[in-house]
Amino acid sequence: MSTPALTYSVRDRSILLPYYKRFLVEPLIPLIPARISPNAITHGGHLVNLAALALLVASAPMDKGWPFFFVPVLVHVWLWCDHADGGHARRTGQCSALGEFLDHGLDLLNATYVICMTVVALGTPPFWSVTAAVVVPAAAAITYWEQAETGVFQLGLLNQIESVCSLSVALTARGLFGVAAIAAIHVGSWPLPDLVLAVVSVVALFGILRCAMRVKQKGGRLAPFVAPLLFGIAVTLAAATGALGTLSAILVGASVYVFVGVCQLNFRIRGERPQPQAGVLVAAVVVFGVAGYRMRIGVVPAALEWGAAGVLTSVFGGLALVRGIEGHRAVEELDRAKAASA
């Protein structure tokens, strides 16, 4: 990147990415009219992915059928847009700080959509659904923290393209055979949906720990990592004890980690080192409190569960939006400054 505040290096070890770009993206980029804004491609892809999530959630009560074949088509449209926008920007000379910010910011949301769709496709097994749907956006947020601390954007062997391909297989199986048939498959004592989500959770958790280790090795500060870590433990405990149900735990976990990720992007834009987020620590205390109530009393009233979940989701969802707007304005200012100095 040419803007100092946004300068970083990328280490992408994705297995499928080189082949995906070579055969499915690069040959088609010249067909995109030069007048189309790369940011329009980014926004369009995000909206298509959001529509896929909405359609799948609406179709969740169905055992099988056409929605489970159509949703993968929408998801692959988004995936293509997400990889074509940068190439189109470079080809047409439309690269910008705003485009880079949108790409990373919306990737945080899109990663959350993809794991939530995976959970729905597999029939939403209770505990592992929460674990996977929370730890994946957490991993994305922690990756942005590492990027802000070290200036290196690290992506693992199993990433976006691999996740979408796996989701496509799960959706196709759901469409053909239904959720009961998938749940009936066991690997040892593990139902297949539980095993898949457990593996996803462990891989993402390993990625989080590797991020923290790399930051420490490069002399970065681990203090900003503490609150997100405690919050993750709190949500896991709340889900394991039944203090929070599947939906409420996913909403709370995803909203807090999206907020964390957007904050890390903003720190990098401003050229600042990440700071601890006191609000995330407060959220962890609240969730620990709900879990503690469940363990002491034996039951959490629905009003308490959804009251706590509703407040946390609304507050951190709203704060993520505010921080996103702040970042949007900041990169627009960077683009204007770059244009003025050109």
Features from the language model and the residues they span:
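Transmembrane alpha-helical core residues of multi-pass small-molecule transporters
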Residues: 48, 106-107, 135-139, 162, ...
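Membrane-embedded alpha-helical segments that form the functional core of polytopic membrane enzymes
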Residues: 42-98, 114-118, 126-139, 191-202
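Alpha-helical transmembrane segments that form the membrane-embedded catalytic/substrate-binding core
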Residues: 100-114, 159-166
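Juxtamembrane helix-capping/reentrant segments at transmembrane boundaries
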Residues: 29-30, 85, 89, 93-106, ...
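C-terminal membrane-associated helical module and adjoining short loops/tails
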Residues: 1-32, 140-144, 150-342
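Generic alpha-helical transmembrane segments of integral inner-membrane proteins
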Residues: 47-54, 109, 169-176
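Membrane-interface helix starts
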Residues: 34-44
